[in-house]
């Protein structure tokens, strides 16, 4: 495996196999963005509050309420192909190798990084990127924010669509392609103009990864991602924009008046799944504390108790 950097410092990683390349890809990212990657680990693991106190408790509860780690533990070997597992495991190994060779730059308490850390990080990042956290905040308000919808074929439109216009034209992230016959030199071009910050955990990081078994892609990603998020290969190029696709369904459950832990489904009262999660905190920077909270789930997914209904 070889890492070469061009005049702009962009890493070009060449490996014999895809896992070789993933190892080098992780190492190159760690060289440039170790602190960002390390700081994100507690967030994905649901133990941010150990390091940041009460500020991290809300996201820790979210991770545990969604059952992300239970999902990964149960399905890691079945939902991910052997090739994919080998790739993310090699990626985690690359991060750990960097940590082992730079002990003065790492926090040992957050190591080692595992392949499941990488997978859960990818899962949680995507949820937040399309606005799932906004839905969670909405259903936990004191009053219901919207009526129960009925089946419709209408296209979902963001509520603030009219506010994000300038001169009648939409503004924000965009991507556009130019076909060869519209280009003076006959080239195909793609402008990936997603509006991201220039620094921080969601600033684009550029890289090129290639293996001798077929992998060859260049583009941008967020630090800590095992794959290229926007970019191009020899045959295809793609971009992405930040938007609000309608990917979350919220159900209002009918609760048994005689048993608050039962809800109606298909004409029958069903028991809610009940569990208790522990959230570990460090208060005032030195005092360890553990808070226990009940989490509920129905056949539809995680349950939140709000405005006298279960959702």
Enumerate the predicted regions with their spans.
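Compact, glycine/acidic-enriched structural inserts
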Residues: 223-283
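A short alpha/beta connector and helix-capping loop motif
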Residues: 204-210
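Ser/Thr- (and often Asn-) enriched beta-sheet segments in non-cytosolic proteins
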Residues: 276-280, 288-294
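Substrate-recognition/specificity elements adjacent to catalytic centers across diverse enzyme folds
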Residues: 3-200, 212-214, 218-221, 227, ...
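Conserved small/polar residues in nucleotide/adenosyl-binding loops
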Residues: 1-2, 308-311
């Amino acid at each position: 495996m070889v890492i070469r950097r061009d005049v702009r410092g962009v890493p070009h990683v060449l490996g014999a196999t895809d896992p070789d390349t993933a190892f080098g890809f992780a190492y190159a990212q760690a060289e440039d963005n170790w602190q960002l990657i390390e700081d994100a680990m507690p967030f994905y693991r649901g133990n941010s509050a150990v390091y940041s106190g009460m500020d991290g408790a809300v996201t820790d509860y979210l991770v545990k309420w969604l059952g992300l780690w239970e999902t990964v533990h149960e399905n890691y070997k079945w939902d991910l192909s052997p090739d994919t597992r080998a790739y993310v495991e090699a990626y985690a190994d690359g991060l750990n190798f960097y940590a082992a060779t730079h002990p003065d730059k790492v926090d040992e308490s957050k190591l080692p990084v595992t392949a499941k850390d990488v997978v859960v990080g990818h899962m949680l990042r995507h949820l937040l990127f399309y606005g799932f956290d906004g839905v969670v905040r909405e259903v936990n308000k004191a009053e219901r924010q919207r009526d129960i919808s009925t089946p419709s074929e209408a296209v979902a439109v963001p509520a603030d669509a009219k506010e994000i216009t300038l001169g009648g034209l939409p503004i924000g992230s965009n991507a556009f392609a130019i076909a060869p016959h519209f280009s003076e030199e006959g080239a195909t071009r793609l402008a990936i103009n997603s509006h991201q910050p220039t620094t921080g955990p969601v600033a684009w990081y550029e890289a090129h990864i290639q293996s001798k078994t077929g992998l060859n892609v260049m583009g941008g990603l967020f630090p800590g991602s095992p794959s290229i998020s926007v970019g191009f290969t020899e045959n295809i190029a793609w971009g992405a924009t930040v938007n609000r696709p309608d990917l979350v369904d919220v159900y209002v459950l009918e609760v048994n008046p005689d048993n608050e832990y039962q809800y109606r489904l298909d004409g029958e009262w069903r028991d809610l799944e009940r569990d208790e999660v522990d959230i570990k905190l460090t208060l005032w920077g030195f005092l360890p504390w553990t808070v226990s909270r009940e989490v509920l789930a129905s056949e539809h997914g995680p349950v939140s108790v709000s405005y006298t209904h279960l959702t």
